[in-house]
């Protein structure tokens, strides 16, 4: 029987490669060849970075949910960088921190553009299959996610585009290369539609607001080209958008309830206390449930949400009134405190209204740094910030869970805000871990974590370059009308259109994270939010943090390890470590310390007792430095001979003390003065041409006595 082989054209009749340029580098989208069972897919090639992007949607809406079930997954495959995973099974496990943060960065601009009433599960997957360090896989994934969703039949009000922005030598650079990112004072990611900004995420070295806004505008111009590229593909192969089945409340019933209970809801909402508000709303909902017994719990939750949302927004837009009575630019009552935990190396508590965060700072050695097992070239992370959000912080009665995406994202934001002000490894050779425990939450806990971290770091004696504070700005829009308000609390965040978080110093911005629930922001709104956050940040720095702790403590906590560092020749590393690690283990045991020797010759020594660390440093110096004539050492007697004793002044370095130089008086027998294993002081008197070292205990004793008498006279 003959076998007929189909041609490539017959196998993939819709296959096509679309090409454009992105920030000066080739960008390609291959479609119609792979992943034929997903709603839409594309293989994105940016330089030599390759990301497979897919979108799928369930055919039926999910029942019993009051939200749009969107799931965005960014996957890093280590084969993309030619690496084998370091896990026991040698396969990728759960998403790492970088993958989770990238998933959030893509989710945030995509989500607001889906219909809010849709309840079908939608999953967007971006898989990094090849990594070119000069071409960002995050940006390739974001653009690919936008492309496949726009081409698919899934209802979505896109497309969007995204770029990264750097600031190298004062010049704005789009999608910076690997080397440019290392030199850049700005790591900004912007996502936008053709006419509005939908997402901003940034870390920066104290960049001013004007420069930041200029960078955003520059990014938007490049994004418009990306969107034009996507629109051309959609025009050619886009599928008709489907009609989705809405699952919601009977609006006739809602309007009847609104007319009857609106004043009751307003009275319950008019308070600055979250607990009082929740308690006042409960009997109203009970009355509604009795009057309308056919309503489900989900219906009641939706009614409460809609009523609260309308009240909060109408008060702000029509009356300029906030639920807690504050002015639009007024910050909630603030308090700061340091030194709360006596055994922690540093601690600080920051309170803003009913939001309260306690942050601790722990100092460790270089070996305590976090190992990174992802596609990044950074093998270890020296500064770590963890954010914990226990159930009791919002009054919930349930057991704590492991950190989720939200906790990881908030921790990363606070971490990003503090990194630019940390001292260099050379000036402060410590691993630093801050942990923010949210004690009470009513909005802006991530910004309270930034303030708490500043307090804890300065309390620990970490010589940060400048204090950092964080604050958020909210937004309410209606058509062309809009209003921003400073320091939003939980109910304003929940029912508002934006949470614009900015961290920074007096000099400039160090971190930004912008979340929105609408189709985007204009430049005017962004500029207004920047200015409000700048004024709020300066107020917190000058009026709250500075009076409590104006500068880092001059001394570390007595419980913190004392760290010292030296640089040794790389060819001497083997001598410090010794065969099988014998030498370094002996130093650690004798000096009660930890030692980390790095490939470039940097040696870090940490010990609780400062004198232990100094002894270890001295021992290392004696190993790597040639003995100096006239120098005094403390050595160990290793062998006894009739004519003298051999003394080891450093591992592998031994000299002879002749019997005539063993003591200040005449010595008949070597055994009368020293024994094997004794620790004695010796002075180097001579080193011959063959490198043999001659030592004198007598001269060392005389020199030390003379030094002692000289100090007494002074």
Regions from the PLM with identified roles:
Residues 2-58, 242-377, 561-575, 583, ...:
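Extended amphipathic alpha-helical scaffolds
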Residues 559-564, 568-714:
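Single-stranded RNA-binding regions, centering on S1/OB-family and related RNA-binding modules
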Residues 2-245:
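Long, basic N-terminal domains or extensions that often function
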Residues 116-122, 157-159, 226-244, 275-276, ...:
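Flexible, glycine/charged-enriched surface loops at secondary-structure junctions
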Residues 153-268, 457-554:
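Mobile "lid/hinge" segments at catalytic clefts and subdomain interfaces of large enzymes
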Residues 108-116, 151, 340, 365, ...:
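Conserved helix-loop functional segments at active or binding sites
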Residues 38-122, 128-130, 135, 201, ...:
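Glycine-rich, flexible beta-strand/loop modules in the N-terminal catalytic cores of phosphate-handling
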Residues 2, 66-75, 141-144, 295-300, ...:
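Conserved glycine-bearing catalytic or ligand-binding loops at nucleotide- and phosphate-handling centers
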